[in-house]
Design a protein with these regions (language model features):
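Active-site neighborhood of HAD-like aspartate-dependent phosphohydrolases
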Residues: 1-47, 148
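Short catalytic/ligand-binding loop motif for oxyanion handling, primarily in non-cytosolic enzymes
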Residues: 15-17, 23, 74, 81-85, ...
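Substrate-recognition element of Asp-dependent hydrolases with the DxDx(T/V) motif
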Residues: 54, 59-87, 93
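Active-site donor-binding segments of glycosyltransferases and PAPS-dependent sulfotransferases
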Residues: 83-111
Length: 162
């Protein structure tokens, strides 16, 4: 039997992505703030940011539980002007999720073009809502009232198998 395909967004879902500069790792905070002030860009475009980020609470454990029943791929977007973040995301996966195996990372600004069963994403952008509009596909809005944490997502996905 083929396992259902489960796409996981990285930023804010698997990776604890900072919403503000104050939440950025102390080792690069000052440099990032100065860069943002000079370039009037968002901190997500700052080169080197992604390499300092840690996993979201409960994410690694949840992925381990879900691997038994789902074909898991990471489906993330990356800042277009921060090419370094693309390779940093790949390195992050190798560091924190080696158990997923190779070639499990897809970078796209059109998540709705991918076919699968589930997409866990904290934002509605980049085709997340549209992904859920296709028959047999579901967008799970991570961090929402229905799915506030990994525990609720795992429970929902495991129940969907019944």
């Amino acid at each position: 039997m083929t396992k259902p395909i489960l796409y996981l967004d990285m930023d804010g879902v698997v990776v604890d992505f900072p919403e503000t500069i104050e939440e950025i790792d102390q080792s690069i905070r000052v440099e990032c703030r100065e860069w943002c002030e000079k370039n009037s860009k968002h901190h997500s475009d700052f080169e080197g940011l992604f390499a300092t980020l840690k996993p979201m609470k409960g994410a690694i454990e949840a992925i381990e539980k879900l691997r038994e029943d789902f074909e898991i791929l990471l489906l993330s977007s990356a800042p277009w002007n921060n090419i370094e973040s693309w390779s940093h995301k790949r390195r992050w996966v190798g560091k924190y999720l080696p158990q997923l195996g190779k070639k499990r990372l897809i970078l796209s600004h059109r998540k709705d073009l991918n076919r699968g069963d589930y997409l866990v994403d904290d934002r509605s952008r980049n085709g997340a809502i549209e992904f859920g509009n296709y028959e047999g596909q579901e967008w799970i809005n991570f961090g929402s009232d229905h799915y506030p944490n990994w525990e609720s997502v795992v429970a929902h996905l495991k129940n969907s198998l019944r």
